From Swiss-Prot:
Keywords annotated in UniProt: Ribonucleoprotein, Ribosomal protein, RNA-binding, rRNA-binding, tRNA-binding
Matching InterPro entries: Ribosomal_uS7, Ribosomal_uS7_bac/org-type, Ribosomal_uS7_CS, Ribosomal_uS7_dom, Ribosomal_uS7_dom_sf
Naturally occurring in which organism (per UniProt): Bradyrhizobium diazoefficiens (strain JCM 10833 / BCRC 13528 / IAM 13628 / NBRC 14792 / USDA 110)
Superkingdom of this protein's organism: Bacteria
Assembly and interaction partners: Part of the 30S ribosomal subunit. Contacts proteins S9 and S11.
Similarity comment: family membership: Belongs to the universal ribosomal protein uS7 family.
Protein name (record): Small ribosomal subunit protein uS7
GO CC entries: cytosolic small ribosomal subunit; ribosome
Length: 156
């Protein structure tokens, strides 16, 4: 970490279709090699598939999926007298969102559907119904924190 200046937070503009900042952050995470238009096509395509499958507002399904994936607590390593403890700590809201987005996308990339659009829509639908690999990842992190609850007094 830098000792001088902390990095300034960049302002993220809302996406053109839904006017939502979280969708823009999601799109930027899907993006490879600066290809924003490809990422836009993937995300909007996935939301379109969700709308046709569920007949619901795709933004609501997306927000529910993200809410079901975001962790509230995680473990961080802390060295105390030669031993390393996994200490459970609460997750800040910005990190919660970033982790949720990251886990959703990585879970979608590991799926077996043909296109990324189909994978992403399937993972979002699963996550909104509390299923899928992204939700499993969140539960694993929570389980680790629960198992190491005895070390919570080492917090910093």
């Amino acid at each position: 970490m830098s000792r001088r200046h902390s990095a300034e937070k960049r302002e993220v503009l809302p996406d053109p279709k839904f006017g939502n900042i979280v969708i823009t952050k999601f799109m930027n995470s899907v993006m490879y090699a600066g290809k924003k238009s490809v990422a836009e096509g993937i995300v909007y395509g996935a939301l379109g598939i969700i709308e046709t499958k569920t007949k619901q507002n795709p933004l609501g399904v997306f927000e529910q999926a993200l809410e079901n994936v975001m962790p509230t607590i995680e473990v961080r390593s802390r060295r105390v007298g030669g031993a390393t403890y996994q200490v459970p700590v609460e997750v800040r809201s910005t990190r919660r969102q970033a982790l949720g987005i990251r886990w959703l996308i990585s879970a979608a990339r590991e799926r077996n559907e043909k296109t990324m659009t189909e994978r992403l829509s399937a993972e979002l639908l699963d996550a909104s119904n509390n299923r899928g690999n992204a939700v499993k990842k969140r539960e694993d992190v929570h389980r680790m924190a629960e198992a190491n609850r005895a070390f919570s007094h080492y917090r910093w």
